[in-house]
Amino acid sequence: MKKQEIKKLSKDEVIKNIDKLKKDLFNFRFQKINSQVTDPSKIGQTKKTIARLKTTLKGKLNA
């Protein structure tokens, strides 16, 4: 997700996306352990997207 897309989301949508990405991250890590990962860079991308979403959520909660 791009920063502009994230800023347009509501608080509830941000929370749902964080939960979904955390599940995806768990699955990527599990695949990595079993050597079934197709694209290892997705782990880093997912972590960065979660961080962006959390930052946006924090800003919306403080506003």
Curated annotation (Swiss-Prot):
Keywords: Ribonucleoprotein, Ribosomal protein. GO terms for biological process: translation. The keyword Ribosomal protein applies. The keyword Aminoacyl-tRNA synthetase does not apply. Coiled coil: none annotated. GO terms for cellular component: ribonucleoprotein complex; ribosome. GO terms for molecular function: structural constituent of ribosome. HAMAP family: Ribosomal_uL29. Belongs to the universal ribosomal protein uL29 family. This is Large ribosomal subunit protein uL29. It comes from Pelagibacter ubique (strain HTCC1062).
